[in-house]
């Protein structure tokens, strides 16, 4: 990946973080967990080689790549990315995010253009991703399935069941990406998950890659791995990345941005 491409992708991440800050200032939401996964989404949707092609996703083409956001509370990051790619107008997020019965809710919903699966009940997206990958394999359909999972979400038993299922069925067309931002909804993850997940995943037989979750080039290289095994990418991230007063503080899991924090974001993100 050449430097001009890296700079272009970094500008996309900046715009997405600005969008997250603005909508969280207006309407609240899951700000810190959205900020932590922006580079992951940018690598998935915008880096080369191109994956998750919009025209195939809109048409539900059988050969499309599929993305499932199992950590459905990262909705603001995904909405901001889909706006970047013109799936729906920016005004939807400006005017309707978390407002009544409008489709841009506090967890991703399949009625939103570009969203494959409704999520929010943690751990469920992993199983859906396994089913879709298995179907592609059985039907000999091309295309990858990508599933973004929170590190706190890994306390759900269904995540581990999905991992074992993917390994047993040799789902080499499936990649789990763990947003390892180290903070769950209430506390630091290390306070309730006491073992090293990567060792367990490797012990089960998965191909595990650990990357800097804020380095788009590293994430993209991991996504391009040609392993013949089911792959798990563990992305080392910072919850609240990009806004210093939000970073690494459990209180910001879901919270309306106040004036002082908004001004900090304006200064640090440059808007």
Predicted features, each with a name:
Residues 12-28, 179-181:
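N-terminal capping segment at the start of a domain
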Residues 65-67, 143-147, 174, 228-237:
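Generic beta-sheet signal
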Residues 22, 33-168, 193:
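Cofactor-binding active-site loop characterized by glycine-rich and histidine/acidic residues
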Residues 141, 190-222, 265:
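Conserved thiamine diphosphate
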Residues 216-271:
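Glycine/aspartate-rich loop-and-adjacent alpha/beta segment that forms the canonical ThDP
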Residues 73-74, 78, 181-182, 215, ...:
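Glycine-rich beta-alpha junction loops
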Residues 168-195, 204:
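A short, conserved beta-to-alpha structural element at the edge of catalytic cores
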Residues 156-181, 230-235:
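A short alpha/beta connector and helix-capping loop motif
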């Amino acid at each position: 990946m050449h430097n001009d491409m890296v700079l272009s992708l970094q500008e996309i991440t900046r715009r997405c973080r600005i969008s997250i800050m603005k909508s969280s200032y207006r309407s609240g939401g899951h700000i810190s967990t959205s900020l932590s996964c922006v580079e992951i989404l940018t690598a998935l949707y915008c880096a080369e080689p191109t994956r998750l092609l919009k025209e195939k996703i809109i048409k539900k083409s059988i050969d499309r790549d599929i993305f499932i956001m199992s950590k459905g509370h990262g909705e603001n990051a995904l909405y901001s990315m889909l706006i970047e790619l013109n799936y729906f107008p920016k005004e939807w997020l400006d005017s309707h995010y978390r407002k009544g019965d409008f489709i841009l809710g506090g967890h991703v919903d399949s009625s939103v253009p570009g969203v494959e699966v409704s999520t929010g009940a943690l751990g469920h997206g992993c199983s859906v991703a396994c089913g879709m990958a298995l179907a592609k394999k059985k039907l000999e359909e091309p295309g990858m399935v990508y599933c973004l999972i929170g590190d706190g979400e890994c306390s759900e038993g269904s995540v581990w069941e999905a991992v074992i299922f993917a390994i047993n069925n040799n789902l080499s067309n499936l990649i789990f990406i763990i947003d390892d931002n180290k903070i769950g909804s209430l506390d630091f993850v290390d306070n309730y998950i006491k073992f090293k997940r990567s060792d367990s995943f490797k012990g089960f037989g998965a191909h595990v890659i650990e990357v800097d979750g804020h380095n788009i080039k590293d994430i993209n290289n991991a996504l391009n791995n040609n392993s013949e095994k089911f792959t798990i990418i563990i992305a080392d991230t910072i919850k609240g990345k990009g806004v210093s007063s939000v970073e690494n503080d459990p209180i910001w899991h879901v919270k309306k941005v106040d004036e002082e924090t908004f001004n900090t974001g304006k200064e640090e993100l440059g808007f």
